[in-house]
Amino acid sequence: MTSLKRSQTERPVTADRASVVSTDGTPKVHTDDFYMRRFRSQNGSLGSSVMAAVGPPRSEGPHHITSTPGVPKMGVRARIADWPPRKENVKESSRSSQEIETSSCLESLSSKGSPVSQGSSVSLNSNDSAMLKSIQNTLKNKTGPAESMDSRFLMPEAYPSSPRKALRRIRQRSNSDITISELDVDSFDECISPTYKSGPSLHREYGSTSSIDKQGTSGESFFGLLKGYKDDRADRGPTPTKLSDFLITGGGKGSGFSLDVIDGPISQRENLRLFKEREKPLKRRSKSETGDSSIFRKLRNAKGEELGKSSDLEDNRSEDSVRPWTCPKCFAHYDVQSILFDLNEAIMNRHNVIKRRNTTTGASAAAVASLVSGPLSHSTSFSSPMGSTEDFNSKGSLGMDQGDDKSNELVMSCPYFRNEIGGEGERKISLSKSNSGSFSGCESTSFESALSSHCTNAGVAVLEVPKESLMLHLDRVRRYTVEHVDLGAYYYRKCFYQKEHWNYFGADENLGPVAVSIRREKPEDMKENGSPYNYRIIFRTSELMTLRGSVLEDAIPSTAKHSTARGLPLKEVLEHVIPELNVQCLRLAFNTPKVTEQLMKLDEQGLNYQQKVGIMYCKAGQSTEEEMYNTPKVTEQFMKLDEQGLNYQQKVGIMYCKAGQSTEEEMYNNESAGPAFEEFLQLLGERVRLKGFEKYRAQLDTKTDSTGTHSLYTTYKDYEIMFHVSTMLPYTPNNKQQLLRKRHIGNDIVTIVFQEPGAQPFSPKNIRSHFQHVFVIVRAHNPCTESVCYSVAVTRSRDVPSFGPPIPKGVTFPKSNVFRDFLLAKVINAENAAHKSEKFRAMATRTRQEYLKDLAEKNVTNTPIDPSGKFPFISLASKKKEKSKPYPGAELSSMGAIVWAVRAKDYNKAMEFDCLLGISNEFIVLIEQETKSVVFNCSCRDVIGWTSSDSSLKIFYERGECISVESFMSSEDIKEIVKRLQFVSKGCESVEMTLRRNGLGQLGFHVNYEGIVADVEPYGYAWQAGLKQGSRLVEICKVAVATLSHEQMIDLLRTSVTVKVVIIPPHDDCTPRRSCSETYRMPVMEYKMNEGVSYEYKFPFRSNNKWQRNAGKGAHSPQVPLQLQSPMISRVNAGKGDGKMPLPERAANIPRSISSDGRPLERRLSPGSDIYVTVSSMALARSQCRNSPSNLSSSSETGSGGGTYRQKSMPEGFGVSRRSPASIDRQNTQSDIGGSGKSTPSWQRSEDSLADQMEPTCHLPAVSKVLPAFRESPSGRLMRQDPVVHLSPNKQGHSDSHYSSHSSSNTLSSNASSAHSDEKWYDGDRTESDLNSYNYLQGTSADSGIDTASYGLSHGSTASLGASTSSPRSGPGKEKVAPLWHSSSEVLSLADRTLETEGHGMDRKTESSLSLDIHSKSQGGSSPLTRENSTFSINDATSHTSTMSSRHSASPVVFSSARSSPKEELHPTTSSQLAPSFSSSSSSSSGPRTFYPRQGATSKYLIGWKKPEGTINSVGFMDTRKRHQSDGNEIAHTRLRASTRDLRASPKPTSKSTIEEDLKKLIDLESPTPESQKNFKFHGLSSPQSPFPSTPTSRRALHRTLSDESIYSSQREHFFTSRASLLDQALPNDVFFSSTYPSLPKSLPLRRPSYTLGMKSLHGEFFASDSSLTDIQETRRQPIPDPGLMPLPDTASDLDWSNLVDAAKAYEVQRASFFAASDENHRPLSAASNSDQLEEQALVQMKSYSSSKDSSPTLASKVDQLEGMLKMLREDLKKEKEDKAHLQAEVEHLREDNLRLQEESQNASDKLKKFTEWVFNTIDMS
């Protein structure tokens, strides 16, 4: 309906009950009730609700009464006229206005038309009260129409704008000819008192009330009468323009009482509440003072039983009856709306069912309101024939809604509409980070709600979820929830249809027609829980709310025996559940298809109407309902229907607004679409040809093209949406109103308004339509360009509830499918929400009543629900049986929602409110009683614990967020709730502890960033108090951990004098209690304050390359092209292409510390890529590791998120002015291993350096126990991790000493802390990833940070590594635990073994994995290392071990750029995996950064890669301490250059430095220059901006880094037995060239010489380092004689460096080829043999080298010899390069083939699907 037609309120209603006015203004009353007419004419008041129905039209005024002869006062008229006496009234004027209003409301005889002031109200004595009530009842019976009226809407208060508002009730009969002069002077003052807001002057200005007012059946109100007869006489009383404001008088309870549901300031629920309160005193008075009004009751009942509420109800029901109805606790509700079912409200609203609410709604309300800016006379253009106009005087009429004052460039504030312009979010009442003080309410809420893992509050519908249907809801994170849909409407279809059940219909005297369905079932899943039988019940009344649910048989008191085949009497079941229902009125329904069909229509009416649902229950080819129900396969069809989901249909209008336009006519007159609009339409849906279109057509003509030739159609989830596009509908050149277009769009409930840049802000007041309730405004920015984006705003009619998804504040949506989904979800939810507005609910209610009447009258038998009632005399003979008591607590095992009335605390608004707490087998919901809306919901599987007392309960869920409720009904409620929680969740009661500090101020435990206790010091105070590993802190000193950042948490623990904590105990196996969302879903991030962006932006769901976190794409690699990102990823991911794996796996594979952003990899910090890699590999190796705090999460690994994590690759102090790590290392070396952990120099942190930024994510507690840390579930997600390994996102493994205590014996002091956590964890500018990266990392440290004292390197903590190393036990699937006593080397070897097994399986799969390029830009920033195809596959695992081991070991990390192909890495023992990465990274990221260079900050340490069987790959030169300028960068580059060169198919920037220079630098260690230190940047570790100048440190004998093996061996026997040993023996300065070569022919030969500088650990301490995985094999190895230190040439001596370099290169190549061959041929050989050969070769080379060094002359003489060798080697090298190129080409081909095969597979799958559908359709047809 559009405004082109006169609105309902503007037209006279010609029903038999309506009254119309002739053109001359004479009232013509069309009613057969002569007495009513006389009564009305004489009094002119229409005081009763009945009279409103037959009252005169709104245009009539009070004068007409004086102009017509008065009817003689006779009989009742005379008594009424003279009563009550004036004096009595004066005396009783003190009576509260509330009672008088109540009297007027119920008796309806108070004078409506006469000017009365509310202040001095008239009081009635008890006899008068009874008489009036009786008269009212009598008159109501006489006037048939009255039965349909609801007195609430007919009293003056129902008209906020009515003139009567300011008039006070006077002590006189209700004659309309009264004048102002007759008002009492004392009461007159009240009219002009400050509380009277209608206007300052007493002048008469009558006008009809707003068309939005609720009106009677006639569509006219009494106050409309006054307007038509208005004159200008000044003696008339003032006309109140807004009744509701007038009613706001001093202190009356009823102040502000308005029943104008649509536009009144008070909600319908509030009105009802006030109405009930006002009703109480009257009932008490009428009963006590009058005794019994049975005569009148009988009189009325004789006239008609179904009219109004019976006097029995009024007189006999207790006060409790006016309270909200509470369902018996034994009843388990099926859905949310069942909990909202209120029987008392249904009784009170019964009369309102068939009342037609003739109102101006939607956009028309705003349009009319905006047009009336002055007195009524100014709006003549809208007057109806009877002079009824909507007087919305915006200034004078304070009753008019003014809008919400929210405006922006898209939409303007408008009366009767509410705007959503961004930042509005769902209400949050829980105590969580989103509503804590540090967050800005709405912005964080909207973001949080988009991110939230569970349903939105408006999206919760069905609460009882069958076990087989319990879903993890994994897709909710990326899919929008459809809201405001009553999915419980399918309860009958799912649980009753075609199953044995009973239907009973009847007409209850209080409730009207009712329908009950009841079914007894024996659910399989309940046998174990107790009661084997369950009764499912549906109770329907004329109200839209329906009671649906079940009750266990054991919970019902009965005279019959429970659990028998016969069951309990249905009468007893219903009487117990619905005691207010008169079961005697029920009769059994016919068991016919028609009844079933009618019931389904009745139940699904809301869905059918709201969605225009086409429920597809017919087979193809069928057309009639009879065919459908008589078909044998109906059952199959319904099953299909349930399985496939229903197909909903919606129609949505789209209006096109060009630049400068704003009005409806302008938009409708845009003949064709512009390019920006076309672009938008193309994104939104598919352009379809209407002629012959067979899908949902939305009233468009698909036969003759009369409504246009094309339209826009799309589908979203289960919805079909047809758009009525203004430019696609027919254009009529001569019709400015474009009726053909408006005919469709004007009848759409939801309309999209598309604005071109420059369009005027939209306002609903420019639209005239009763149906358009919601407008979604979309404005294009930069249309038709690559940067096109859209901003969105919504304006909705004020009685339409809010709906999602929320619009983020200040965000524009790029053109993408994400935006399309957002917009379609918004539109669907808008229409669903609009159907909850009063207009549509009234229409639906009328329809529902008709259905029920039809069922109750025409489809019942004569069989009552209790057949025994036919022979009542039988019961006289025997004593009546007593009912057995129900089993106590039986209902607690129900599957549906058990409900308790509680008072909940709203932490966001700091207030309490009454609500209903419902707990089902799947959900916990809180429903506010006043607004009847869900304000909180979460899955029962997300509950982790609770704290209970006698009257209050705090429930903790997900990550420690909590809600708090109090019981005020019964002291037993809390106990029952706790029992119910125990039944439906895995949580437990919390424990409160008071923790003491030891002498050092330490609490004795580590806590990770999630608040989970990572480790507890044995026998410490915390241990004694009962704190266990895996316990979850939820409160610290009364502050909820969920509201704290990690830094704040640690500060509380450090600074509080008395530390009181509330913990959730772990499971029996010491794993922490986790919510389902944490276990199975992506972790929710800790947001920084930038959260304005929509979730979808942060998590690019649709771009595969952005999800590479799992693959660990070395987030550090400078943008590795997708293809390079190794297929490995996909292989690792079970063959699912990169980023395409299903969310669950993805989620699992996304370690928290990894950033989820999709930003270019190069931007992701690669703190030393190596570091990263390491970590990442570690993390990824178990890619599933979810960071569980418990195991803490090793998952934080660097993963791809790389950059955003602050894993510090070096201790913070490493950057500016820090002491050289070397020195630090030295300090701690010994202590690390077992020392006290106190020797930690505390480095100051430098905020900028990347090193800081990259805290390793793995923070292993420094304890030496290694628990099984990861269990990888089949799906690849770490199901449980044992706490030991903590990879704290922000802390470096142990190596950052500050983060964790280094010594394995660390006492876990409670002070340390993640101080660094505030540093920015992102590089340079924050990119998406930061936003979205799991900022977990942000400050978290795996250990509680609670060890302040410990800052040294924790390399020593074997545990740390160990833990992590063991973690990758996934290979064999076994968990190996390294006992506390394992030495780090043992741990490593253990890891080796596990990895070995893994490696075998995986090595072939991982292609060129992790090759890091550490190419640095010598000018200045270091570019992140890139891992080739970065994928972490198991390599990672292997790498873990290696990295771990190295971490473990305190050995300085050496950057070894060993190149090992994935194969190698996977080699049985982990191959030397990414050397660099592991090397430094190993420590850096996941492992303790144990590797700090001993040489100087400038040195890069690469850890050597271990050769598969433990061969040592590289021991390398680490001492870069003294280098000449630019060395640092160059060195780094050179070291890895080979690898980058080899691994990357694409050319990589090469550094200026040459190998020769590098060798010089490496060899000439004694001559460093300060500049070199300045220039040197720790590659992956430092951000371009943050160089790490290292403080010069005395060289202090280059403690060469014993390569892992050598370290090992040294630990065992201090002589070198390992292969590395002989290399290690070189002087601290010696250079070893060790590199492992991949033997994997299929993968690119990854060769990178790993140059590492061996460093001797200080104090002779040896740590297990990477390559020492060969622990197992050392016993088999023969010690190799110590070759002695190799002397290096004096730097000053003449030396032909070019020759030397050539020789070195030749040697390297030769070795490389040798390795490749041996790898290929002897892969199975033990590492020992490989290493032996290698060592021999190395020995020979070294010997020759050393001999050459002995004397310069000798060296010179051998130059020729070396040159010869060099030529040969060059040739070999050339061949190798050619081979490599060939292999690279093959890899590319394989990748292409893989993609092609995937596409073909997809196509085949699609075809198969189509074929299957065709087959089924064919079968159906047959």
Curated annotation (Swiss-Prot):
PANTHER family hit by this protein: RAP GTPASE-ACTIVATING PROTEIN (PTHR15711), SIGNAL-INDUCED PROLIFERATION-ASSOCIATED 1-LIKE PROTEIN 1 (PTHR15711:SF10)
Q: Which residues carry this modification: Asymmetric dimethylarginine?
A: R1619
Tissue expression as described in the entry: Detected in brain (at protein level).
Per its database record, what is this protein's job? Stimulates the GTPase activity of RAP2A. Promotes reorganization of the actin cytoskeleton and recruits DLG4 to F-actin. Contributes to the regulation of dendritic spine morphogenesis.
Q: Which SMART domains does the protein's record reference?
A: PDZ
Modification comment: Ubiquitinated and degraded by the SCF(BTRC) following phosphorylation by PLK2. Phosphorylated at Ser-1367 by CDK5, creating a docking site for the POLO box domains of PLK2. Subsequently, PLK2 binds and phosphorylates SIPA1L1, leading to ubiquitination and degradation by the proteasome.
Q: Where is the composition biased (Basic and acidic residues)?
A: 84-94, 1395-1407
Q: What is this protein called?
A: Signal-induced proliferation-associated 1-like protein 1
Q: How does it assemble?
A: Interacts (via PDZ domain) with EPHA4 (via PDZ motif); controls neuronal morphology through regulation of the RAP1 (RAP1A or RAP1B) and RAP2 (RAP2A, RAP2B or RAP2C) GTPases. Interacts with DLG4, PDLIM5, PDLIM7 and LZTS3. Interacts with the actin cytoskeleton.
Where is the sequence biased in composition, kind Polar residues?
A: 1225-1244, 1417-1436
Gene Ontology MF terms in the entry: actin filament binding; ephrin receptor binding; GTPase activator activity; protein kinase binding; protein-containing complex binding; ubiquitin protein ligase binding
Q: Where is this region: Disordered?
A: 1-30, 47-125, 277-297, 1134-1165, 1183-1252, 1286-1324, 1358-1382, 1395-1493, 1567-1595
Pfam entry (one): SPAR_C
Give the UniProt entry's GO cellular component terms: cytoplasm; cytoskeleton; cytosol; dendritic spine; glutamatergic synapse; neuronal cell body; postsynapse; postsynaptic density
Coiled coil (UniProt feature): 1753-1813
Q: Name the gene.
A: Sipa1l1
Q: In which broad location class does this protein mainly occur, judging by the first location in its UniProt entry?
A: cytoplasm
Q: Residue limits of the Rap-GAP domain?
A: 638-855
| Domain PDZ stretches | 992-1068
Tell where it localizes. Answer: Cytoplasm, Cytoskeleton; Postsynaptic density; Synapse, Synaptosome
Q: Which residues carry this modification: Phosphothreonine?
A: T1348, T1569
Q: What is the effect of changing S1367A?
A: Abolishes phosphorylation by CDK5 and subsequent phosphorylation by PLK2, leading to prevent ubiquitination and degradation by the proteasome
